[in-house]
Every structure is written in C-alpha cells, then in structure tokens.
Amino acid sequence: ILKKSLKKIDPINFKELMSDDSIVLLDTRKTDQFVKCHLKDSIYIGLDGRFAPWVGEILKDINTPIVFICELNREREVITRLSRIGFDNCLGYISVDNSTNLELYQETNSLESIDPKIFIKNNSNSKILDVRTKSEYNNGSFKNAINIPLNKIDSSLSYPKDKKLQLFCAGGYRSVIACSILLKNGYTNLVNVEKGYSRIKKLISSWL
C-alpha cells in the first residue's frame, strides 16, 4: 500500500487526475496553514487532531480515491494512518514546505479566521453555527448560536450560500473541517472563530 500510495504528484499530473470528480482532495496540514492558503475544493482534516475518526466520519466510503496534501516528510504518516482505518485508495500526494506554490496546481482559497474577542464584539450581522456535538452544545454555547454538529453539516445546513456564517467548535479544529466542507459545497462568506468555545467562554467570564 505504502509503495503504491507514495507517489508525488506534479502540477501537470494533478490537473489530469482531478478531472475525475470522485477524487477527494484531502488537506492534512496544520489548521493555520489551511486557513492561510489551500487548494480550492479541498477537504481539511488535520493530522494533528482526531484525524482517523473524522476521515471515517466524513469520507465514509473506504474506497474513496484520495489525493492528499501534507507537510514535507509526513507523507508516510498520512498513508499509514489512512490505511489503518481501511482507506487504501491513495492516488498520490502533494507535500508542502515554505517554497511550495500551491497556485501551480489549481486555484487557491483562504479562509477568514478571526480572534474570539472580535467575534464576541461583532456578531450581530450573521448566522452563528456551533459545530460541536449536541451534548457539548447543551452544556453551554454562545447566545443565538445554532447547533449543527460537524458530522451533519453536509446534509443539515440550508442557508443562502452568500450570507455570512460564523462557525466555532471547542478549540478551532472541527470548525475548520466544517468550513472546508461548506466551501466545497459553494458557501462563499464563511468566518472561522479561532480557538473555539473554550476561549470564547473564558473571555466572556473574564469580562463579567
């Protein structure tokens, strides 16, 4: 599996490969790297979070063909961790360091990501989504936030795709996954709240 999957993809091969709509472009880098610049239509599930459970939950079908984006020298780790949960259909990878120009592959996006202090002071003009689990939400959330857990975001959200949506989770990992799914589904006005509800809660209690 490792030998088959350990195939570096150059921009020309990438364009040919991605003409197949069934291929999932999986970005496994750190959250802040994805936020800053990522390939259009890529799904974010970072290696440094609960990687395997979320791959299983979001991609579902173990036969899904995957091209992944990773940090330099983490290629084997991605393939091994995918393989452990049955995802063996890796077609290749793009490894990224400071000199990599992702725009050579295809159009790139960035994700607006804001400090919780800004979010708390300025949230009246948008819908707010809490993408944590129902039980986390029931234990306390931000005023006016609507709960759509991450594993239901793909099927449960019906909202105008150009209207502003602000998303948070507990610590800032799941909300970026959710944003990546919504971006791929055509949402264009998304804001990720960094550090999530754990930080929001601390700030609010310190201001009271």
State each model region's role.
Residues 1-20, 30-34:
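C-terminal accessory/connector segments of nucleic-acid motor ATPases
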